[in-house]
Amino acid sequence: QVRLRTGIEMDILSNSEQRFLDYKSIALQGQQFDEIIEKGTAIVDIGGGSIQISLFDKDTLVSTQNLKLGVLRLRESMNFLNASLSQYQNLIGEIVESQLSVYKKLYLKDRVIENLIIVDDYISRLIRHYYRKEGKGDITTREQIEEFMEKSRMKSTLELSRLLDMPEEDMPALYIS
């Protein structure tokens, strides 16, 4: 119908095409990207149904694995369990940790992940909005994210949505991410 009304041709991308374009845009960061992947780096693409982890070490792609831990899938699990937002952290932590422990044994082995590149709809928006506004740029530390998450636990979903300029209904998905 879009083509009939506007004359614009549209194609729908598959998951793999979308992820390829995401990775390509990350790689276009040039020298900064090349420097980052020299050390242990994981690109974590958080989708609705799954998370894809691509592991780089010494400038080489070591592995890519898909885990069924997407935001919508986990949110559905939380709804099934009638979990409140305050319970999300512990419940999701248990679910994610069980799958990540298998991933670590099979693929991570003795590698150390020094850099994490996140591709998603929620954490990326948080970093762009909150940290850029603070003059901190696109790169954040683990400590900064943990500090923000700790502060956000003290806020209502309405306060948090206003702070981040995001719809309040997106807050559960942000907690899951």
Identify the role of each PLM range.
Residues Q1-G40, L55-S177:
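Helical "lid/coupling" subdomains associated with nucleotide-phosphate turnover
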Residues G47-S50:
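Active-site-adjacent helix-turn-beta-strand microarchitecture at beta-sheet edges
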Residues T41-D45:
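Short glycine-aspartate micro-motif
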